[in-house]
Amino acid sequence: MSTPSQRLQAIDALRGLVILIMMVDHVRETFYLHQQVPDPMLIPGTEESLFFSRILAHLCAPVFVVLTGLSAYLYQAKNNSAQMTREFLLKRGLFLIFLELIIINFAWTGQFPPDVIYLQVIWAIGLSMVVLAGLIGLSQKWLWVISLSIICGHNALDQVSFSQMPILQNLWFILHERGWIEFGDLIRFRTSYPVLPWIGVITLGYCIGHTIFNSTYDVAKRNQILLGFGLASISLFIVLRMINLYGDQAWSIMPTSTETVMSFLNLTKYPPSLLFILWNVGLGLILLVLLQRVESKPWVKPLIIFGSVPMFFYIVHLYVLKALYLTAVTLFGTTHGEYFGVDHVSTLWLISIILTVALYPLMLKFSAFKHKNKHIRILKYL
C-alpha cells in the first residue's frame, strides 16, 4: 500500500490542474462578459474556441467535488476515526459556506452589504461536506446506493416544481433547480449551484476512497481499478448519449461535423446532469491515474503546489481578477457595451498563463507556510 503522502501528491496535482483550468473560465467571466454563454450552450453563434474552453472548464467542479469526497476518506483512514472525520467535514463545510456568503460573493459583486448573494461552487462543496458528515456512519453498501441513486436518478426530477408552495419551492431551488430565493426587498439569493447532484458526487468520491484506497490494493492494482472506473464512466456516457433519451437534453446532427461534436458534448452543468457527471468524473479518474504515474516529474511540482492550497488560490485569484478589471475600466473605459472586454478567446488564455506565473511564487510560499504551521487550525481549511 502506498503512503498517504504518495497518494496525496497525485490528488494535489489533479486538484492543481483543475483550479488552473477553472481560472481560465473565471478570466472569461471577467473579460469576456460581452459574449455570454447559457447553460447548456447555444451551438449556432458560439465560436468554437469559446465553446471548447467552456467544455474544458466543465471538468473542474465534478473533479474537485469527487476529490473532496476521496480526501475525506483518506483523512478518516489517516486518523482511524469516523467521528473526527465527521467533525472535520462539518467544520470545513460550514467554513466554506461562510466564505461563499461573505468573502467570495464580495469578490464577484463588489457589494457590501450585498443585495444579491450567489450560491456557487464553494457553497455547493461546503453544503455537500455537511451532508457527507451525516452520511459516513452508514454502511458502504448504503453509501454506494445513495450516491448512484442521486447521480443516475436526479434527472427524473427535472420537471418537478413546487411553484404553488413557496417554502418547498425555495428548498427545491437549493436542491435541484436554479432559482431566486427572496427575502422581501432586503436580499436575494441565487442558487447558481443546486446541491443535490453534488451530494451524490462527493459521496461517490468517499466510496471510491473506501473501496480501493486501502491496504487491500497496491498502487498498481488501485490505478488499474481507477482506470477501469474512468473508462466505464466514459463508455456509459457514450452509450447513453447515443441513445439520446435520458440524462441530458438531446443532441442532434448539425450542418458541420464540428458543430455535431459540439452538440454531442453540450451538457448541462446547472444542475450537473447524469451525462455531465459521467463524462467529467470519468475523465478526472483517468487523469488521476496518469498523474500518479508522473507525480515525481519536475513539471508536476507546480500543479502540486497549486493543489495544496486550493482555497487560498481561489480567493486570491478572484480578488486579483476584480482588481485587474477595475484597473482596465479606469484606464480604457468600457469597450463592449457596459463591459470592458478583450476581443479573442486566445487573449483569455494568455491572461491566464500570465496570472499562473505571477501567482505561483505566492502559492509556493503559502504552501510552505501551511505545512510548517500545521498547529494553526484555520490553515488546514485553505
Task: Enumerate the language-model features and the residues they cover.
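Alpha-helical transmembrane segments and their immediate juxtamembrane cytosolic regions
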Residues: 1-382
